[in-house]
């Protein structure tokens, strides 16, 4: 791990948290973000990506930006004429921002320090227990979402370091950027696993209940349609019977 403070171009993300190990493509349209990418492409391709606390500010202030983010390597930049640029990055490591420089009219910068995540559980039994809890939660989540879990579980089982395991599982299951940021910012490895497993279980429960609600709605609609069909049949039958009575009276 490098304890050196490194000054990197900064991109604040709206509604997104990028984790170490993630490879992701996203659009950028703000002038400072585009300039940050251009600068990074000329200087080792590295940039500090951190989410804004809320997506609304176009130029967020210090208290509107999280302090924990991810140092990423830019893999590809596609410039779309008259539109946003598409940037593909790979998350390298977790870093904390010791200072933000937001006054520059062209580019925002962050003074970053890498966070040491090389440690983990000291007890292998505890590690394996937590990993099995997470894998079971991932399997339940995938089943509740209609997603095949085999490849995800197989990939998780190959990851040796504890933090990397958490980030991979988080990226596969949790979309909420604030949850991702909470997991990223948490230093204690057991707490990371707790937040992750609890969040995945909660998502699986939501998916299950969503299916229950959908099934209930479909049943009610089916009953209403059946009732409507029966009522229509009765109405038509009454009209036909009424028509026959009138004919008899005319005779």
Question: What is the meaning of each model-derived region?
Answer:
Residues 1-251:
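N-terminal low-complexity, acidic/polar interaction/targeting segments
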């Amino acid at each position: 791990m490098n304890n050196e403070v490194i000054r990197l171009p900064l991109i604040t993300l709206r509604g997104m948290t990028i984790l170490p190990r993630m490879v992701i493509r996203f659009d950028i349209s703000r002038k400072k973000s585009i300039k940050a990418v251009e600068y990074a492409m000329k200087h080792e391709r590295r940039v500090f990506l951190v989410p804004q606390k809320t997506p609304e500010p176009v130029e967020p202030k210090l208290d509107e930006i999280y302090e924990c983010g991810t140092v990423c390597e830019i893999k590809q930049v596609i410039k779309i004429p008259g539109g946003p640029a598409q940037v593909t990055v790979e998350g390298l490591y977790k870093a904390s921002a010791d200072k933000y420089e937001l006054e520059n009219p062209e580019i925002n910068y962050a003074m970053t320090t890498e966070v040491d995540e090389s440690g983990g559980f000291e007890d292998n039994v505890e590690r394996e227990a937590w990993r099995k809890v997470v894998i079971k939660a991932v399997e339940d989540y995938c089943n509740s979402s209609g997603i095949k879990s085999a490849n995800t579980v197989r990939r998780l089982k190959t990851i040796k370091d504890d933090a990397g395991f958490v980030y991979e599982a988080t990226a596969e299951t949790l979309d909420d950027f604030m949850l991702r940021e909470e997991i990223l910012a948490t230093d204690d490895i057991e707490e990371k696993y707790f937040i992750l497993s609890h969040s995945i279980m909660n998502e699986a429960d939501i998916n299950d209940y969503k299916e229950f609600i959908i099934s209930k709605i479909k049943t009610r609609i089916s009953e209403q349609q059946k009732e409507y069909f029966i009522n229509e049949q009765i109405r038509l039958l009454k009209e036909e019977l009424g028509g026959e009575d009138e004919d008899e009276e005319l005779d």
